[in-house]
A protein has these predicted regions:
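Metal- and O2-centered redox machinery and metal/ROS homeostasis
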Residues: 1-166
């Protein structure tokens, strides 16, 4: 969870810092932000001093550094990461939440906050709106290709995060 927190914090900070960019602005959606929920879960599992107990994750640090560079130099790239991370969370979140709840003996609240989106009452409609925002972006072919490249990077970076857990 600590590695995920580092990644989401970098993504969400980048989105907020670049919210004035016309391609980024439609994707600054705090209802999706996961860093606060991850902090709740980490406090539940590790206690009040959870921040001092996190072990560094090389894969998370590489991913977060990449997101920081995008925020500084190529903010539209953040959109691809928002798409892959958040739509993945919304799509598989319920199944993963149920599995985590059974494995951890939890029913709701702290420990499972990452999987809950209380500000999104209709997940399917929200996902459709997110995709519509993406489809409406005025992208050149080169810009669209750059977003695809970033989405592929996001998948590879996520795989590296999970490989560290194995």
């Amino acid at each position: 969870l600590g590695g995920l927190l580092r990644v989401y914090a970098a993504l969400e900070d980048g989105l907020l810092r670049r919210r004035g960019h016309p391609l980024v602005a439609p994707f600054v959606l705090p209802a999706l932000f996961r860093a606060p929920a991850l902090a709740v879960d980490l406090a539940h599992f590790l206690g009040p001093a959870w921040q001092s107990r996190l072990a560094p994750s090389p894969a998370a640090e590489r991913y977060a550094a990449h997101l920081d560079r995008l925020a500084a130099d190529a903010p539209p790239g953040l959109v691809a990461h928002a798409y892959t991370r958040y739509l993945g969370d919304l799509s598989g979140g319920r199944l993963l939440r149920d599995r985590a709840a059974r494995a951890l003996g939890l029913s709701e609240g702290p420990g499972l906050a990452f999987y809950d989106f209380p500000a999104i009452p209709d997940i399917a409609a929200f996902k459709a709106d997110f995709r519509a925002r993406l489809d409406a972006l005025p992208l050149t072919d080169a810009a669209a290709a750059a977003l695809v490249d970033e989405a592929n990077f996001a998948f590879a970076a996520s795989a590296a995060l999970f490989a560290e857990l194995a």
